C-alpha cells in the first residue's frame, strides 16, 4: 500500500492511522512535511523501541545492550567534524530516549557549543574516541571518509570485544555470526557500488572494507575486489554461499537482497532462540530494516521513482 502512495503526506497519513508509528509521527503536519523531518522521527522511534527492551537487560551485560549508543555517538562526532571543517555551526536534531541519553559517554548537547577541533579533542579526551581522533591532523583538510572508517572500525571492535567478554558457547558464536554476516553484506554491497558507479582502484576498494570480519573465503573476496565490473561481481556472488542469483540490475536491487538475507537470518534467530541477547540483537536488526524500508519509500516517492524500483529497495 505504501509504495503506491502519490505524496509523502499520504505516506505519513497512512502511518499515522494504520500503523504503530502514529505516536512517533503525531507532530508532523501532513500538509507541510519534508523527508528529513520524517527520517528524524523514524530514527527517534527506533531508539525508543530499543530502549524499551534495554530497560530489562541484566546489569552485568549492560555494555552489550548499549552498543547502539556507540553508533549514535559516532554519527554525532562525524556531524560535528564536518561542520567544523566547513566552518558552519548548526544545532543537532537528534532526540534519543532519556534512558539512553543517561548512558552516553559524553553530554550530547554540549557538542553544539564546541567551536574548534582543539576544543572537540579536549572534550572527548576521556572517551574511547580520543585514541582515533588524536591521530588526525586537523590543521589541514582531512578525509571525512577515512575518519569515519576509523571510528566505524572502533565500533565493530567494541561490539566484538563486548560479545566475547560477556557471552560464551553457542550464544557467543551466534551473536558473532549475526554481526559478521551484517558486516560482510555491507562489504559486498560496497564493492558492487564501487564497481557500478565509481570505478575505484582495487587498493581504494580494499581500504574501505572491514575484511577482518569476512566469512567468505579470502580468495572469493579477492576476486570480488578485482572484478572487472558489476556484472562479474554478480556472477561471482551467484557461486557463493549467499547465492544472490541476480541479473544486471541497479544497486538498489542488490541492496534489497542483502537486506533480505540479513532479515531472514535475524528472523530465524528471533523465532527459535530463547537467549535474551540474541533476541535483542535480532530485534534491533529487524527494527532497523523496517525503519530503513520506510525511509526508502519516502525517498522514492519524493523523487517520483516507479513503484517497481521502490519495492526493490
Where are these regions (language model features)?
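N-terminal domain-start signal
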Residues: 1-313
Amino acid at each position: 500500500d505504501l509504495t503506491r502512495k502519490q505524496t509523502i503526506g499520504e505516506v505519513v497519513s497512512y502511518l499515522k492511522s494504520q500503523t504503530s508509528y502514529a505516536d512517533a509521527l503525531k507532530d508532523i503536519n501532513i500538509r507541510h512535511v519534508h523527508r528529513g523531518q520524517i527520517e528524524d522521527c523514524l530514527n527517534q522511534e527506533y531508539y525508543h523501541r530499543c530502549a524499551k527492551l534495554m530497560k530489562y537487560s541484566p546489569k552485568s551485560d549492560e555494555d552489550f545492550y548499549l552498543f547502539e549508543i556507540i553508533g549514535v555517538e559516532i554519527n554525532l562526532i562525524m556531524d560535528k567534524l564536518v561542520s567544523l571543517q566547513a566552518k558552519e555551526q548548526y544545532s543537532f536534531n537528534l532526540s534519543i530516549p532519556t534512558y539512553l541519553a543517561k548512558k552516553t559517554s559524553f553530554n550530547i548537547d554540549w557538542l553544539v557549543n564546541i567551536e574548534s577541533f582543539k576544543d572537540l579533542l579536549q572534550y572527548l579526551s576521556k572517551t574511547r574516541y580520543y585514541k582515533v581522533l588524536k591521530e588526525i591532523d586537523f590543521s589541514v583538510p582531512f578525509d571525512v571518509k577515512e575518519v569515519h572508517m576509523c571510528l566505524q572500525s572502533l565500533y565493530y571492535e567494541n561490539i566484538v570485544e563486548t560479545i566475547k567478554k560477556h557471552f560464551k558457547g553457542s550464544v557467543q558464536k551466534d551473536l558473532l555470526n549475526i554481526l559478521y554476516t551484517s558486516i560482510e553484506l555491507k562489504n559486498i554491497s560496497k564493492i558492487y557500488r564501487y564497481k557500478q558507479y565509481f570505478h575505484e582502484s582495487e587498493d581504494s576498494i580494499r581500504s574501505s572494507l572491514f575484511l577482518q570480519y569476512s566469512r567468505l573465503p579470502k580468495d572469493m573476496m579477492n576476486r570480488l575486489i578485482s572484478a572487472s565490473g558489476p556484472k562479474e561481481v554478480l556472477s561471482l556472488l551467484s557461486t557463493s554461499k549467499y547465492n544472490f542469483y541476480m541479473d544486471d540490475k541497479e544497486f538498489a536491487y542488490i541492496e534489497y537482497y542483502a537486506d533480505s538475507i540479513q532479515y531472514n537470518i535475524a528472523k530465524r534467530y528471533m523465532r527459535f532462540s530463547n537467549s535474551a541477547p540474541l533476541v535483542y540483537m535480532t530485534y534491533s536488526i529487524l527494527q532497523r530494516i523496517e525503519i530503513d524500508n520506510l525511509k526508502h519509500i519516502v525517498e522514492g516517492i519524493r523523487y517520483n521513482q516507479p513503484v517497481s524500483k521502490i519495492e526493490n529497495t
